Amino acid sequence: MNTDALKKMAAEAALRYIQPGMVVGVGTGSTTNFFIEALGAAKIHVDGYVASSIATENRLKAQGLNVLELNATGDIPVYIDGADEADPHFRLIKGGGGALTREKIVASAARLFVCIADDSKDRPMLGKFPLPVEVIPFARSFVARQLVKIGGSPTLRSGITTDNGNVILDVTGLDFSDPLRMEETINAIPGVLDNGIFAHRRADVMLFGSAGGVIERKA
């Protein structure tokens, strides 16, 4: 099975968490795109979907699905999104698609966070994938220097402006022995909007597509 088939398998398995009448949060990225396609085919009568990016909003609308503003919604029972890495403690690295800040906001607003991925994202420890950090452009050089001081090697992601009007620094070389502490340390740097460590708001359920079928884990 190729990677896309595994992603699609995990995405379709997430449909079991969607019930009629819900408001559903939807993430951003290649695996989530398969989930959006599955939603369009399933035609579950939910109240609406809260998108974590403009790209996701456009994809949902292209499927004829009702998109709601986060500020106009109350309870979000479930949020479905992918990950670039996941560890055994349900902590994640996200943001390869550049939507990490809005993803973290919608995930934090949801009661249940279901993460979908192919099984190559299942790692014993975070840190192989470069960590995305969303930075206000004015502070880019300053933030990069601070990241170097804590052991990181930041690279500006070229050609990318986030939906919030910011830039992304992709950082390698960081110590992920304590992801929660690293998340807090980076977010304390002035000029950082957020980073792609999801340790405060971990996933509640992991669905990994694998050659043997869907692997489901619950926190």
From Swiss-Prot:
Reaction equation(s) it catalyzes: aldehydo-D-ribose 5-phosphate = D-ribulose 5-phosphate
GO cellular component: cytosol
Alphabetically ordered keywords of this record: Isomerase
Entry annotation: catalytic residues: 103 (proton acceptor)
Molecular function in Gene Ontology: ribose-5-phosphate isomerase activity
Physiological role: Catalyzes the reversible conversion of ribose-5-phosphate to ribulose 5-phosphate.
Family annotation (HAMAP family): Rib_5P_isom_A (MF_00170)
Subunit structure: Homodimer.
Name of the protein in question: Ribose-5-phosphate isomerase A
Annotated organism of origin: Acidithiobacillus ferrooxidans (strain ATCC 23270 / DSM 14882 / CIP 104768 / NCIMB 8455) (Ferrobacillus ferrooxidans (strain ATCC 23270))
